[in-house]
Amino acid sequence: MNFIKEIKQDDTDARVKAAKRKKAEASYMPTLQEVFVTGWINPKTGKKKNSIASLKNSDADKAKIKAVYEALNSGELGLEGIPTNKLTKTTVLSVLYPQLVAIRKEEMIHHLIETAPKNYHLVNTESALNHMVTTIEKEPAIAVDTETTGVTHDDVIVGYSISCPIANEHFYVPFRHTTGEQMLPADVCLSVIKPVLEDPKVLKVLHNVKFDHEKFLFDKYSINMVNFVDTMVLMYVLNENEESYALKKLATKYGKHFGFNEKSDTYEELFGKGGFENTPIKVGYIYACKDTHLTWSLYQWQLGHLKKQPKLWHIAFDIEMPLIPVLLKMHYRGFNLDMEYAENYKTELQEQITGMEQQLSEYFPNINLNSNQQLAEYLYGTLKLPNNHDGSVDKDALKELADEYEGVKILLDYRKLTKLLSTYIEPLPQKVWSDGFLHGEINQMGTKTGRLASENPNLQNIPPAARKIFVAPEGKLYMSCDFSKMEIFIACELSGDPNLYDALHSGADVYSVIASKSYGLPIEQCGDGTVYRKHAKTALLGCMYGALPFTIAKQVNVSVEEGKEILDNFFNGNPVLTAQIHKCHELVAKQGYVETLQGRKRRFPEIPAKVKLLNKLDQMIKQKTGKTGTQWDKELDGIYKAKKIPYDLRSKWYSLNKEIQRAYRQSFNATDQGSGGDICKIALINLDKYFSELNKDLPPEKHYHIVSTIHDEQLIEVPEDIPMEVIKQIEYIMCHTIPLHVTMRTDNEFYKRYYHDGKSSEQITSGDLPQA
């Protein structure tokens, strides 16, 4: 009995001790620094608690945790009864951070109202509207912005803001808010601004004009705004490396130079997500007025910089600004999509994919083909196929295995078809507007070099099989007018290389000529189909993109050593072009930028300082080893092999040199590709001028429309009976876009269904039309 009592007593004692321990733990309240930063040890129990900052946190979570910690310390945020020993990462992120956001949002809105400038006006009465109209009448230029329900095509304007710089007054006109506050009717508000926006004598300044232009044009009252400039695009001309071109981001970064010293809060920071229609007008008008106020001020600051740089002024106001109306026309015209063909093709692809899935289940039993690990284990482990890519199952690795195993060949075809179906054939019809056309966008700010980029969808990536869903409207064809070997013509102009000049001027095969010079062989031995021509072509095009020996080797299926030899032969055999490439490197190292033929800059602002630092490291390495890092890198084909150099010094030299060499490789490409981008943009402007005149004397069903630009190709919607003289004029406009020592050439083809049954100019004009 005593034994049993002792056991019970021991059990009771243990429970008492546990209860006391829990009480001790509960009674200790760590400091905020311990909870967030250092972690803490309960002095009574010795138990270690990790800090919230020491946990695995994303960058976004780190910023939120830091904000909460600082707010708690400053008293901006309270714990609201939460004991510090109960503070967890979840509590901080899901409870305290939202509270902090709400507090700061309320403070920002209060500050916005309290500091609202006296020249910011809410226009919600007839007298206020009349005052605005009278003020605008005296202004040769105004800033304009719209506030909308969202950013899609179907979203609508809920109000617009106008800044009048001479009067120094700023207006917001609401008419579709849902907050129940006083507003004027939409027809009244839009009817007074329509003649102003459509007046070619009044300059309109906007930030991201394409968005606002579409909203005005497709509104119920259809306002076609003309004579405008875009401060977002001007900023791109001034600095193609900006992290963000959003107005508030630019104002926060540069505002101190044009009168805005405080941070400019974004819409989401002030009002959260959702459309502007839900924003209280009494607050929203201040935000909206500031938008156009900022836009005008930013524009004046940009003009000051552009006036000091005539070449960039030319890029901005002779190329980029005139291009915007052309791109808008292209966007509004769009592609005619054959919905019936798309649906039938989708069914056909689905049937093919289903059949392939049955085949693949036999070749890859019980394997999840979406699992790279399972696929690799089966191919290289079970089947023992050659493993030349460290277990990779990417496209390149599978291509090498296709001849070894039939299942891999089917798998490659399967992936190709599933991508075609899921990326293009299924989603493209869903993007069609109510007019039955697909309205893609051409982004003039989409690349660092100045080339145009296709978006929503990216027509440049659409494979030929998917392009067949684009069919020209009744009585029309698609004319593809493609600059032939544009990069090479530009490289010839930039360098003055006699080899390129002679080949292009005479019409000889440029790749055979380059091969002959590279290998010191008669041109007869370097014709089409020879390995010399293939290697020279790869090297010529590769040098324009800064290709490394590894890339060259991969493209022609040789070793890296042979790839290096191909490049060496090319550079040695073509010294003038090589000198131009090196000149670009020197310009980047010295001044931090290169220029296109038209004067567009591609900036590498950090490189000159890094080159100086690399030179210092070179001398440090030379003092220790007798050779510079550059010499070691060249001799050993990689400085990492130079064990005589201390690791830290070697590593620093390697990473710095890698960044510099990347900029060097990009520099010649920037001058060549950037010049090509400028030429394509000017060609679009000139073609649009020609078509605008041509269409004046033609019925609408015979009108010419530019519908897209894909790389160096302009795609034009033309009538089926297009005359040869119009074709020749289109060719002339493109080939003579800018004066070059060797006139460029174009390749033309005509399609009813894009990329299907292409016909030449001669066939078209003789009545041999392509089939749908």
Describe the residue ranges of each PLM region:
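Conserved beta-strand -> loop -> alpha-helix junction used to position metal-binding or nucleic-acid-contacting
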Residues: 223-240, 247, 507-511
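Short active-site loop/helix that positions an aromatic residue
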Residues: 151, 210-221, 234-238, 377-382, ...
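Conserved "right-hand" nucleotidyltransferase catalytic core of DNA-directed polymerases
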Residues: 2-48, 56-61, 66-72, 77-179, ...
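Short hydrophobic/aromatic beta-strand micro-patches
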Residues: 715-719
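Nucleic-acid-processing active sites and adjacent nucleic-acid-binding tracks
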Residues: 166-204, 335
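Polymerase palm active-site segment centered on the conserved acidic dipeptide of motif C
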Residues: 219, 342-373, 568-586, 721-772
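Acidic beta-strand-to-loop metal/phosphate-binding motif
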Residues: 143, 201-209, 480
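Conserved pre-motif C helix in the palm subdomain of viral-like polymerases
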Residues: 290-297, 665-688
